[in-house]
């Protein structure tokens, strides 16, 4: 692995750019987020990274969803990116916290109207009686917001995952892969270690 930066966010930015440029037909911002559920079991699911900054990784969801409730109960989460076609993986451990309402409002305004209405209509992760129930709820919100601005519901918004460790994995021949792990220290410097594959 070349060009190992002192800051893992610089290396993430470089890898993310490279997968977007050379990764082919791949959704580069697809990631899994793992949480500890209210039942005590881990669960992961795919979400989309919408922004990253030097502070962390931002995604959006329904705060009342299963993942939202899990984060409220235990904000320690794990993100992972896997890009098979260029043999790279990134694993991020961190703490999730809600972003500001202004940031959530700004992103919500950029979404298509159908997605905005879906945020109102779907009680994400709740049991529903039928498909018709969902379609009827969507239709009711279409009517409610007809010729009106579709505002962001309070139960929908963004989280930022602030990393405490980031591991970069690069495939190599003979399974002698590169693994570089960054761990955040108390003084906010990053400890860099090479791990055996």
Which residues fall in each region the model found?
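Binding-site signature for planar aromatic cofactors or substrates
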Residues: 1-197
